[in-house]
C-alpha cells in the first residue's frame, strides 16, 4: 500500500488529520523497526538534534501523524506522536530504551547501537558526536491499522 492510500484510508476514520502526509522509514533496518512499530513493541525513537538544526528541519510535534514506511517505501502503519523531548545522549533513560523495543531493550544495548549510529551520522555531516550531544526523543502510538 502506498503512503497516500494508507493516509486516505485512515482519513475516513479521522478526517481531522488533513491532507499533508509525513512519511518516513527508520534509517537502520527499516523493515525490522517498522514491524516492531506495527506489532506494538516499538513505541519510541531517537534522532540527532544537531542534524535537525543542520538541515533546518523542524522537530516533530505532539499530536501529529506520520506514515511509517518499509525499505520499499510501502506504508506499514500510521503513528501519532505523543511526546517529544530533547536531552543529552548520556541522560536517556532505561524507560526510553525499553520503549524503543530493540535488542534486549536494555539501556546498555540502546546506548551501544545508538552511539555507533550517531557517530556515523555526525561524521557524515562533519560533526563530532559526544555523550553530551543532544538527542530528540519521541514517543508515539500506532493508530492505523488497529
Model-derived features: where do they sit?
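Mixed-charge, low-complexity intrinsically disordered regions
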Residues: 1-78, 87-146
Amino acid at each position: 500500500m502506498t503512503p497516500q492510500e494508507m493516509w486516505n484510508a485512515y482519513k475516513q476514520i479521522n478526517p481531522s488529520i488533513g491532507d499533508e502526509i509525513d512519511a518516513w522509514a527508520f534509517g537502520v533496518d527499516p523493515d525490522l523497526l517498522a514491524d516492531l512499530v506495527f506489532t506494538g513493541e516499538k513505541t519510541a525513537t531517537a534522532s540527532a538534534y544537531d542534524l535537525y538544526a543542520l538541515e533546518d528541519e523542524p522537530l516533530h510535534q505532539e499530536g501529529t501523524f506520520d506514515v511509517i514506511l518499509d525499505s520499499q517505501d510501502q506504508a506499514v502503519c500510521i503513528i501519532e506522536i505523543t511526546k517529544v523531548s530533547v536531552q543529552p545522549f548520556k541522560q536517556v533513560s532505561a524507560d526510553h530504551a525499553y520503549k524503543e523495543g530493540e535488542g534486549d531493550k536494555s539501556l546498555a544495548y540502546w546506548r551501544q547501537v545508538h552511539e555507533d549510529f550517531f557517530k556515523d551520522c555526525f561524521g557524515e555531516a562533519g560533526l563530532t558526536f559526544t555523550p553530551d550531544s543532544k538527542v530528540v526523543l519521541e514517543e508515539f502510538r500506532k493508530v492505523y491499522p488497529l
